């Protein structure tokens, strides 16, 4: 997910994207805790995507 693509989305779309990412992060964390997660790098990628979405939301709130 690119930050430039996120900047083109509306605030409502960003909020729904953030909600989806948070749900995905929760599911991945549960899989990691139970030892079912094979690709642990996805957890890091989702965490960074959440940070990107939050950054763009903050930028839009300030502008």
Curated annotation (Swiss-Prot):
Keywords: Ribonucleoprotein, Ribosomal protein. GO terms for molecular function: structural constituent of ribosome. GO terms for biological process: translation. It comes from the Bacteria. GO terms for cellular component: cytosolic large ribosomal subunit. InterPro entries: Ribosomal_protein_uL29, Ribosomal_uL29, Ribosomal_uL29_CS, Ribosomal_uL29_sf. The keyword Thylakoid does not apply. The keyword Ribosomal protein applies. Belongs to the universal ribosomal protein uL29 family. NCBIfam families: L29. This is Large ribosomal subunit protein uL29. It comes from Vibrio cholerae serotype O1 (strain ATCC 39315 / El Tor Inaba N16961). The lineage of its organism: Bacteria, Pseudomonadati, Pseudomonadota, Gammaproteobacteria, Vibrionales.
